[in-house]
């Protein structure tokens, strides 16, 4: 009616981090989005978020991402990378549970892309000393070892 597209996500029906839904939409392991489109949609989301927060008198989104204190430029991107790690690991676990608990094999091919995207997000975090955490490197090492082992098993078959 008003020529606006609205996306309503009731998957978990609860409030969560501001970055959860955009990460779910743009980095879903079983939906391929080219990087140019993803970047364009992400930029539009960031601008819309800032505009809506200002319009509602909520202040800057960068200040609201974490109530612990003032934020600096790029913090929203850091929170996106952190959310990608959390959301993609959740997705990989969900896909595995669909197979083990329900016998559904249709999501199995999405586990590897989810883990590879998790590795990319961890590398982005580790590439910025202000963003990196000691646990990020350990998690990246474990995931890469798993993916390497998994690839070797597949090649032997």
Q: What kind of region is each of these model predictions?
A:
Residues 7-9:
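Pre-DFG segment of protein kinase catalytic domains
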Residues 93-157:
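ATP/Mg2+ or Mg2+-diphosphate-binding catalytic cores
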């Amino acid at each position: 009616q008003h020529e606006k597209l609205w996306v309503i996500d009731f998957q978990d029906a609860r409030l969560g981090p501001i970055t959860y839904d955009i990460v779910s939409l743009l980095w879903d392991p079983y939906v391929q989005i080219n990087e140019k489109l993803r970047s364009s949609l992400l930029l539009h989301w960031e601008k819309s978020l800032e505009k809506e927060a200002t319009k509602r008198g909520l202040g800057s989104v960068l200040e609201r991402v974490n109530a612990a204190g003032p934020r600096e430029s790029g913090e929203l991107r850091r929170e996106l990378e952190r959310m990608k790690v959390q959301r993609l690991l959740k997705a990989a676990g969900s896909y595995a549970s669909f197979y083990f608990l329900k016998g559904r094999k249709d999501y199995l091919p999405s586990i590897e892309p989810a883990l590879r995207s998790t590795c990319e997000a961890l590398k982005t975090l580790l590439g910025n000393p202000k963003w990196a955490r000691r646990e990020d490197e350990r998690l990246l090492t474990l995931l890469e070892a798993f993916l390497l082992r998994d690839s070797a098993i597949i090649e032997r078959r």
